[in-house]
């Protein structure tokens, strides 16, 4: 199924009542329908049918369709040229229905530059005007460059590790016949082994916010109290491992992307060193994001699933139900830790239909109580968004790191 299915599965039908009124019928109450609809974009029915775009395709398997590479819409810019992974050109749409007084840009050229050093050099040399992918190690250099500036804001994305707690045995471990991660004491030991302040200072150059919960500030259900990390305490970790029956630790492989999150592989390397201090021998398997996510979600070519992995999660609906439906529900499409709790499943279903906000918030709080106590995931940090540009270029920074060029101005 499409990755969008969880956002629209409550919708039974949609019809146009007038030129400017759409009626949506759901299969029951949906308290976050409006939040979900912010992620759904309207396509022309005639265009979609004419180009065979009615059936979803499997992006993870490399499938594509006409509508994945051809524009259809009524936005402020038109695509006039596209060479995938090389160059895309947008021109102002003079027939746009919206207010064009918010921007003065006529042409945008998108140039994907994968290499960090090359991208920064292109900015400082004047080859490009703006980038929303800024290496943390280059922030001060860009700031000190005449004619350039850097903007920062907390991002709606939390980075964490997942541990398979549901399988009878880990694929990569030297422990056979049982699963160390099935024991909460082991998961807790892994948590206490992580010094996120050290990772913030040494790996992230201060550009991260250590997290105690796997959802970002601003999301319904997040609280400052829940975001307080448990203390870094490797001695307690060793004690917990011994109590769980692993005084000498164990071996496991950590799957990590090397081109998706800010300093993702470096974070994994640092964490592996910390796990080693408590006797857990972790082997790094770092790979490109396309391969990483495919193998975490579907298994590798041999059908082997990941024992431990890095994942980042943003919440476009700004509501915890989005987190729970994907990551904690027993049937969640990204619940690759194989967590299953009947009460949490009940709460996920209930918070999806409860319209009394106080009752719903209580359900969300109970779900977080259960899963934080379970140590289902190891929260690492909330990312920080950095964007850099020439001083005369103003692109408002957004916490989802998706720039809206209809608010961009060049002075």
Predicted regions mapped to residue ranges:
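Long beta-strand-rich cores associated with HINT superfamily self-processing modules
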Residues: 387-411
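Gly/Pro-rich hinge or "lid" segments in bacterial periplasmic/extracellular proteins
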Residues: 39-103, 107-109, 235, 239
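Extracytoplasmic/peripheral linker and loop segments enriched in polar/acidic and small residues
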Residues: 184-188, 192, 200, 278-297, ...
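Structural transition elements
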Residues: 77, 192, 209-243, 260-265
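Ligand-site clamp/hinge motif
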Residues: 65, 95-141, 281
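Periplasmic-binding protein-like
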Residues: 36, 175-219, 263-267, 371-379
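Periplasmic binding protein-like
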Residues: 128-129, 145-150, 254, 267, ...
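Surface-exposed binding/hinge segments that line
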Residues: 3-56
